[in-house]
C-alpha cells in the first residue's frame, strides 16, 4: 500500500487547484481521475474558450445553507488572485459582458496552467484510474483503485455534479458523501437542453450551435 498525505479524487478545476494548494503547503498529494483526458469540462466551458471567472464575483452571488463559508472562501482567494495567476502565465483574455472573462484563444490554456501549477507543487496525477472503494481505518483513508491501494491522512472528493454524463459524470461523489454521513441536498437539473419533435428538428435543426442575445420568461419570471 502506498501512503501519502492527501488524496484528491477528481482532476477538474476544483481538484487540480486544491491539489496545488495542498502541495504548496508541503503536503504530498496524489490526484486520481478516471478520464483519459484531464479537465474535460473546462475544455468545453465558455464555448471552448473557458469563462474562467467574473470580475464582479461576490459572496452575495451564491446560494448556500452556510453563507459565511462563501464569504470566508472568497475573502481568502478572490477573483483578482486568479486573474493574476492567469496573467502570470501570459494567457490573453477579454471581458465579454457583465464582467465575464474568457480566454482569447482556447480553454486548453487554463487546463495547461492548472497542470503546470500541479507540477510545480510536485503533485502526482494518475488518470485512467478507477476507484473501487474507500474505507476509513486507524485515522487514515484507504482508497482501493485499479492501480492498487493507497492511504492518506486527508481525502478530497472533487468529482463534480451529475451534469454531462458523456464526460463521465456519475453519482460517485454523492455516494461517498453519504457513506461518511455527509448530508446531501436533493439535486435538480439547472441547465437543460431543448427537446424537439422530429418535425421541429427538420425546420430549425440547422440553427444548432448559433448563439444569440435572448431573454426567456415563464409565469412572469424571467
Show which residues each predicted segment covers.
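Predominantly flavin-linked oxidoreductase catalytic cores and closely associated redox partners
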Residues: 108, 117-222
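Cofactor-binding loop segments of dinucleotide-utilizing enzymes, especially the Rossmann-like FAD-
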Residues: 11, 34, 189
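Hydrophobic/aromatic ligand-binding patch that stacks against planar heteroaromatic rings
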Residues: 17, 21, 34, 42, ...
